[in-house]
């Protein structure tokens, strides 16, 4: 989507093994498929010998990211944030390999350093690099103000703290790359600029597009609610069905984004029967999260239910009271 210097980044990554990070909000009890493209980016980094850093926003979640939001988020209790962090970590341990010491993911919580900041020192050393003029120009701030919606001073500071995260990871973990959704471009640029001004080091920022379905809706939720990457919140069968119900126009794109199939293989089969491709997508995506046997079982349940008009063993059941 966007990159601060794509040619130089490619050169650096070809010549060295680097560390790259993505920050994840911890406001929800787990992650949903709206975060899956970011997870796949970390998976790709690892696949090619680089080391992913998963930054868990224990500190910034206590403030709230105003990007793309129309109103101030509800502040969660510290206990709830810690519980969310543990659940989110579990998701990454499924998608990322944790055994190879050179590429295993580094999990780090930004509360570790944000909670220790001295306010006066922070303003003198970090705040001096940010101008109100520039901060007011970012969409996350501008849109809220243009709509005459309130933006707290706490939220206004979010972009500075995110930039500081990159500086901290660069200093302590030699991290050279931050990846995020396209709505994070302004925050990422702030981090790149801060490091350049603070230590004259070259680092990079890269964004991925926000995935919009062919229907025009944002990826991550359905009429039934969020498509969670957690079997206690969404059954493997329902997860399989989400992918099986992909719009025809999105199937080819999703096979490239959300499976480990090689591009050559996807190109080779792209003209196959669309329903066969949807089943392939559902099986590959479900196997990655829940395992091959769960994917196969979900497919068999769907076949029994829809082809043979019988009820499969793992079809989710809902109890309805007689009066309802």
Language model regions located:
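A charged helix-plus-loop insertion that forms the helical arch/lid used to bind
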Residues: 66-82
């Amino acid at each position: 989507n966007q990159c601060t210097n794509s040619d130089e980044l490619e050169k650096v990554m070809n010549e060295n093994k680097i560390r790259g990070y993505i920050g994840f909000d911890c406001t929800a009890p787990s992650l949903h498929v709206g975060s899956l493209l970011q997870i796949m980016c970390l998976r790709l980094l690892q696949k090619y010998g680089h080391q992913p850093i998963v930054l868990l926003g224990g500190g910034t979640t206590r403030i709230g990211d105003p990007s793309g939001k129309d109103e101030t988020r509800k502040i969660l209790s510290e206990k709830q944030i810690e519980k969310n962090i543990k659940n989110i970590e579990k998701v990454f341990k499924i998608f990322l390999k944790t055994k190879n010491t050179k590429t295993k993911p580094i999990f780090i919580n930004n509360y570790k350093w944000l909670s220790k900041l001295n306010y006066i020192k922070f303003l003198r050393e970090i705040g001096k690099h940010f101008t109100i003029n520039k901060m007011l120009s970012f969409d996350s701030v501008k849109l809220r103000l243009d709509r005459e919606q309130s933006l707290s001073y706490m939220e206004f500071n979010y972009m500075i703290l995110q930039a500081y995260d990159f500086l901290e990871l660069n200093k302590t973990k030699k991290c050279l790359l931050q990846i995020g959704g396209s709505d994070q471009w302004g925050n990422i640029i702030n981090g790149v600029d801060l490091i350049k001004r603070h230590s004259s080091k070259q680092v990079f920022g890269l964004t991925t597009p926000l995935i919009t379905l062919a229907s025009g809706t944002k990826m991550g939720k359905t009429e039934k609610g969020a498509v969670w990457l957690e079997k206690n919140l969404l059954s493997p069968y329902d997860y399989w069905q989400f992918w099986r119900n992909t719009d025809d126009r999105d199937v080819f794109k999703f096979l490239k984004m959300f499976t480990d199939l090689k591009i050559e293989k996807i190109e080779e089969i792209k003209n196959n029967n669309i329903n066969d491709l949807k089943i392939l997508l559902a099986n590959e995506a479900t196997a990655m999260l829940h395992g091959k046997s769960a994917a196969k079982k979900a497919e068999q349940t769907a076949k029994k239910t829809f082809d043979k008009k019988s009820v499969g063993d793992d079809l989710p059941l809902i109890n309805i009271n007689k009066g309802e």
